[in-house]
Amino acid sequence: MKKIVSLMSALVISVVSFAGISNAADSKKPIVIPTHNWSSQIVMAHVIGGIFESMGNNVKYVNTDSQAVYESIRLGDVSLSHEVWESAFGKSFTTALDKGGLVDWGDHEARTLEDMGYPNWVAEKGLCPGLPDWTALKNPACAKNFTTPDSGGKGRMLEGPQTWHGDLIPQRVDALGLGDLWTVKFAGSADALWAELVAAEKEGRGTIIFNWTPNFTDGAGFTFIDFPPYTAGCRPEDGGDGKCGSPDGYLKKAVNADFPKTHPAAAATFKKMSFSTSHIGAMAALVDVDKMTHEDAAKKWLADNKSVWTPFTK
């Protein structure tokens, strides 16, 4: 009988302890949310921050490097990441994950693609017949339609900031034998990519830029080039020859390992958060098309989409 009573007491203590943890109030310390250098990520940071604030949490935003942020999360300097793009940041994410201190917090509904492509009017004007097949880029007549003053007589591809992918695209161009006809330049920011789309159309020349989906361009007419398919290990950094495009990838969330303990309610809400391609594209469009500030875009998105985000808090 004593053993039964002792066992029942232990069970009661366990249940009470678990309930105490699950119902614990979030810490008053701010939830530190990172911002990077593309619109959807910054707007979503403020969307998520707004949701946390509606729950009574304090929020702090910090501008961080998009590769180094996972180490910052692991060490506890940043609380979470809400846009972990597989192609660009998967390696940095996995490295931090393997060290411990960072936790995979699930995927968004949206799937991602990050690669080089062109606005649809490039094909409509016949500037490079054969696209989106990458072999169309082997034609000198195609390349000459994409020259710019800084391209040395070659067709120019405009990559994103070099901090995003390093030399991935230049390595691919050389590996595919396109280096004699094409050169890769790096944009200073995402805004520079969108400015290039406007400038190229105004000047009547072709343009190939780095882009991604989900993004505001999903509804504006943009096509990704069909490079040879991605396979595990095909990139130079993994020992491959570099003759491959980008993978169809995840869009993950990540948190510091202590976040579910310090902010259990916010962590549970963040776990439930899952945005679709259309949600994320709309966030970006409010800034890149409608020219709103990131903060105002987030406020508008939250006001217009209560039915989307309110269930995350339940």
From Swiss-Prot:
GO cellular component, as recorded: ATP-binding cassette (ABC) transporter complex; periplasmic space
InterPro entries: ABC_Gly_betaine_transp_sub-bd
Principal subcellular localization: periplasm
A Pfam family recorded for this sequence: OpuAC
Signal peptide: 1-24
Binding-site positions, trimethylamine N-oxide: W38, W85, E114, W164, W212
Subcellular location: Periplasm
Domain of life of the source: Bacteria
Gene Ontology terms for molecular function: transmembrane transporter activity
Keyword set, alphabetical order: Periplasm, Signal, Transport
Keyword Glycosyltransferase attached: no
Effect listed in the UniProt record for changing E114A: Abolishes the binding affinity toward TMAO
Function: Part of the ABC transporter complex TmoXWV involved in trimethylamine N-oxide (TMAO) import. Possesses a high binding affinity toward TMAO, but presents little binding affinity toward betaine, carnitine, trimethylamine (TMA) or dimethylamine (DMA).
Quaternary assembly: The complex is probably composed of two ATP-binding proteins (TmoW), two transmembrane proteins (TmoV) and a solute-binding protein (TmoX).
Name of protein: Trimethylamine N-oxide-binding protein
